[in-house]
């Protein structure tokens, strides 16, 4: 028996072009690697000595953007901005955690607060969270957003929709279309990002509320905590969801076993769904999301408690039936909003994933090939800001907001 160690592309060429490969030849395929890599960007000591499940799952080689790019602060007068949606004419619709939506125009001027939004519970991590425009926004002007809503025995993540008035001063007919289960007396881990799929259904991330009593519900299919859900524009479970006909599960659930997912986006070329979530102390994750899959929290994790205590007895990082993250960070990235880049403005960034980092104070650029991370870069790290969301504009520019109230615009020089 002969062993041939090849890259996947070389092996494919051989198989297609040669009929003389000896029998009983074993191909050992090496993963695709990004050219022109440098040392990994993470140089700090990890919180744990846990080993990755496969090569390239963490601390991948670094990359550096060759194209000259520039950035500017459009405004520093926002108040705890959380989510960004791109309107026409260079305008951005931005949520502020305390409960307001505002429009920032191309000159960086900020509108008055848009009237008509429901009240939010803005304590700690709660408030007005992510937002997304209806795929037919140009004709129906409908906006969807997530927020923390107070209830009788605590609060919960909710989803609302409304119609932005033509004068852009009010949200008309605003109404709540979905409320997560298990209202809880806490103020952490709400999730709160939204994205539409190609069929016009809405995917929403929901956190597990952090506490020991609620984190286990990430594994409970009768609870919406620690889940990614998929609903219609009216807040009903999408008809072809994986648990649509399962009486022992909530029909809106799409995937489960999540901790606090604050980033979600579709790959622009292959249509795959990706999500990023906060781990505990270490173990922030980037996951490839598939229906009915279990992403493991709190059973498996690459992190530890903030106290330094291990999670689980014994602690484990892998278990049959639970998905491994495509990539994880230790120390943490604190991943919030994220977007895949089209390549319109800076071609070398095409299909790269950009993730806003909070405690890490940078934007992570990830190069992804064949659903594997093959390169990582840190952008705007010298700004020392807590980046909360990042989106692509209509002309290939990137916009990002920070907890301190800044709105940045990143463009090709």
Segments the model singles out, each with a brief description of its role:
Residues 249-288:
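Repeat-solenoid scaffold signature
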Residues 105-106, 162-169, 229-239, 289-296, ...:
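Short loop/turn segments immediately following beta-strands, especially the blade-tip
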Residues 258, 373-394:
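Conserved blade-ending motifs and adjacent loop-strand segments that build the rim/top face
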Residues 1-4:
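Positively charged n-region of N-terminal signal peptides that target proteins for export
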Residues 30-205, 211-212, 263-266, 272-275, ...:
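Acidic, Gly/Ser/Thr-rich repeat motifs that build Ca2+-stabilized beta-propeller blades
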Residues 10-27, 31-35:
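Bacterial Sec-dependent signal peptides at the C-terminal "C-region" and cleavage site
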Residues 212-223:
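Acidic/polar, solvent-exposed loop segments in beta-strand-rich repeat domains
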Residues 112-126, 174-190, 233-254, 298-330:
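Surface-exposed loop and turn segments in beta-propeller and other repeat-based domains
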């Amino acid at each position: 028996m002969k062993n041939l160690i090849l890259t996947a592309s070389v092996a494919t060429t051989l198989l297609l072009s040669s009929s003389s490969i000896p029998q009983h030849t074993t191909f050992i395929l090496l993963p695709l690697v990004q050219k022109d890599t440098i040392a990994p960007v993470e140089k700090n000591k990890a919180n744990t000595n846990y080993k990755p499940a496969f090569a390239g799952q963490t601390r991948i080689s670094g990359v550096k953007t060759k194209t000259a790019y520039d950035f500017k602060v459009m405004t520093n007068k926002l108040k705890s901005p959380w989510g960004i949606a791109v309107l026409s004419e260079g305008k951005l619709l931005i949520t502020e955690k305390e409960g307001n939506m505002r429009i920032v125009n191309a000159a960086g001027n900020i509108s008055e607060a848009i009237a008509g939004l429901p009240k939010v519970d803005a304590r700690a991590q709660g408030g007005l969270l992510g937002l997304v425009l209806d795929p037919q926004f140009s004709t129906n002007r409908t906006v969807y957003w997530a927020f923390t809503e107070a209830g009788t025995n605590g609060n919960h993540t909710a989803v609302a929709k409304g119609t932005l008035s033509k004068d852009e001063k009010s949200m008309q007919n605003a109404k709540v279309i979905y409320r997560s289960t298990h209202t809880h007396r806490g103020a952490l881990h709400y999730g709160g990002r939204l994205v539409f799929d190609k069929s016009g259904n809405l995917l929403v991330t929901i956190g597990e509320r952090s506490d020991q009593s609620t984190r286990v519900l990430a594994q409970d299919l009768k609870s919406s905590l620690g889940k990614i859900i998929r609903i219609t524009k009216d807040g009903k479970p999408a008809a072809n969801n994986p648990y649509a006909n399962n009486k022992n599960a909530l029909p809106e659930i799409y995937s489960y076993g999540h901790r606090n997912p604050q980033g979600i986006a579709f790959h622009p070329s292959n249509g795959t769904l990706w999500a990023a979530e906060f781990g505990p102390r270490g173990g922030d994750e980037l996951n490839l999301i598939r229906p009915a899959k279990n992403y493991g929290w709190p059973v498996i994790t690459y992190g530890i408690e903030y106290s330094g205590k291990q999670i689980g007895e014994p602690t484990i990082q892998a278990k049959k039936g639970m998905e491994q993250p495509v990539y994880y960070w230790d120390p943490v990235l604190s991943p919030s909003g994220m977007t895949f880049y089209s390549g319109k403005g800076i071609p070398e960034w095409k299909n790269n994933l950009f993730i806003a980092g909070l405690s890490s104070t940078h934007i992570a650029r990830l190069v992804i090939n064949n659903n594997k991370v093959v390169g990582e870069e840190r952008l705007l790290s010298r700004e020392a800001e807590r980046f909360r969301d990042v989106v692509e504009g209509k002309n290939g520019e990137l916009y990002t907001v920070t907890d301190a109230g800044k709105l940045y615009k990143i463009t090709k020089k």
